[in-house]
Amino acid sequence: MENIQKFRKKGKKLGEYMLTKLRLLRDQRKYRSQGVTLKYMLDRADSRDLVIVFSSCTRKGIRARYNYVRTLKGVGCNKLFLLDDFASDHRGSFYLGSNMRFEEAATVKELIDRVQEQTGADRLIFCGSSKGGYTALNFGLDYPGSYMVVGGPQYFLGQSLLDTGNIEALKHIAGQVCKEKIEFLNQYLPRKVVDNRYVPSQRIYLHYSDSEHTYEEHIRYLCRDLTEKGYRYSEDVAHYKEHGEISLY
């Protein structure tokens, strides 16, 4: 009986994997601008809401993937899934760009604006966890009235890329890596949080664990700045020990 159950589980996972691959072949599109090719999937619905979902970071050796496609399957709204497969290892660049040019970020914003116009959406909801959480904040802060649903985000990007050994992403974003560029990246998101003029109209939903390293290194400083600047934000606090466990929440 145990072997049969294991076989069924493997079969289910294989089936889900094949369905995902088939969907990519059918639904994945490409948006090209400023020399950037941005891959995405768009689910249209009769709704005034648009959910924008960003990729998390994969393990070393595994290319970037779309996130939360199955999770949001039954949600009746427009959904834009964006793939961050930039950098030489195709694990992503936080949707920023190469050599400090930020052309990927500009392309992402172009596509979001275009899809918002096409769908007629008047409420934008930016979602992601870990790397995707950083990105959901980075883009969500640019839009008045936006909602940001964020899990375990990094806050000081330069140091995070150094600490996690994500050197390919760092080299892609910075070009020639130096202390000045690392510090610029460290302050990139904090500056946006502090200087944001849309604070009164925005809402942030933040999930994190207070027992894994991202909290002490990043999230407690993010919460400090959100509080000091008067953001409306809600916290969902867990206590798991490993950052990767965020995928279970």
Model-derived segments and spans:
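Conserved hydrolase catalytic core segment
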Residues: 138-148
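Active-site nucleophile loop of the alpha/beta-hydrolase fold
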Residues: 150-161, 210
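Catalytic histidine-centered segment of alpha/beta-hydrolase-like enzymes
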Residues: 241-249
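The feature captures the conserved acid-bearing segment of alpha/beta-hydrolase catalytic domains
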Residues: 166-236, 243
